[in-house]
Amino acid sequence: MENLFCPICGSRRVSPAANGIYMCASCDNAFSFTKEVTYAKTTADIYKASVECVLEINTIAGENESSGTGIVISPHGYVLTNAHITGEAMAGVGNMKNYCDVIIAGRRPREILFMAELIYSDKAADLALLYCAEAEEMPALKISYSTVKTGDKICVIGNGKGEGLGIVDGIVSDTCREIGGRKLMMISAPVTTGYSGGPVLSADGEFIGMVTGGRDGETAMNYAIPSVTIRKFLASAEKKAGIRL
């Protein structure tokens, strides 16, 4: 039992239920290590199970302040977000170079502000990896290996307009849309400024992508980086930055 962990949130607070089914005391999800378990989840269920893995991110570049979202993807304090969120703020000079503010769990008005350091970035993929010591031992979202289909229901958690974490839902409008040389997933969820860097979650609560942007005035035409691209980025980060996720 000491080697078991929840495949959804990463917690080790796992206990057997019945017939090969296990329960996680941290996220209240049921799962099996030997067979697929299917059950309906509400948007509220998905939010409850995943929100502790999502952070608010605030960056300042000169007089410009911007907000976004980050995802805890490792219990070692590593946070995934968009490169366009960290770009200008983390290209500064002096003691603040390569740092930005993060709000743990975003429980406004009880937010806790910490600093995060830029570890690795890929501007072409619009992905950045941060390190925040205070995020160590936090539950982490595990990247899904499931096949995503056009029409699948999804939810997105994000820091909309910089006003705190919230959740919106929609569907996968297209699993592969080429935009600016990148292969992205198109989603109908009405994400706004600040949702960039937020996780796209399947109807089962699996982490299948991350918001990267949308079209001005087209709230039902937004784009997400698919999980396969995220996995490649993280593998590159481990190799080139010499870290272990």
Descriptions of predicted regions:
Residues 14-15, 32:
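Short functional micro-motifs and their immediate structural scaffolds
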Residues 39-47, 92-104, 114-118, 138, ...:
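C-terminal cap/linker of serine protease catalytic domains
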Residues 71-72, 190-211, 223:
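Catalytic nucleophile loop of clan PA
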